[in-house]
Amino acid sequence: MNSTFIKPQFKRNLNPKIGLIALATDFMIERDFNKVTKGMNIDLFVNRIHCHFPLTSENLIKMSNTVTEVSKDILPNEKLNCIVYGCTSGTIVAGYDSIKKKIKLAKPDAEVTTPSTAAINALKKMNISKISIFTPYSKKLNDQVVDYFKKENFVVTSNSYFDISNDSDIAKIDQNYLYETLLKMDLGDAEALFLSC
């Protein structure tokens, strides 16, 4: 039998690699992320993080304590261009700087973003200062989201919430009912509606 060495040829140009940290209970995020990035030359790699119930500040901080480990397991020993921590309320409660620091311990070269920080950046880029906020969370967690936006110098004209404490239940909300609810909201003179996941 002949055995021949053939020199491999590797790709010269690789697509940007995006890591996504998704809640273990999240039904929607991969599908939604793929819709947003459809047609873009990026490669998405997902790892899931254990979510504790009920959704409280204490449990969201507890969840964030494993961010470094979860980040390490997204293409171990490979560089990523960006990591998305896919938890709006978790970022608000734990703090973006804390999340970023934990991700950078695992992937020091990666940019870090989250839904809440991306929303803030987008709203500011569009010169929007008055917003209405809808969340599916408990009153206490809902109020923390509202306070977060106020601290970022947004005027919150109105706010509504569902008072759900289990992340698995959030994805089970009837979409038509959600749309009807949002259409009935009193937005005041808001320039935008922020819908927290």
Please give the residue ranges for each predicted region.
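Glycine-rich phosphate/diphosphate-binding loops that line cofactor/substrate pockets in enzymes
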Residues: 74-79, 120-129, 187
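Periplasmic-binding protein-like
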Residues: 80-86, 132-133, 190-197
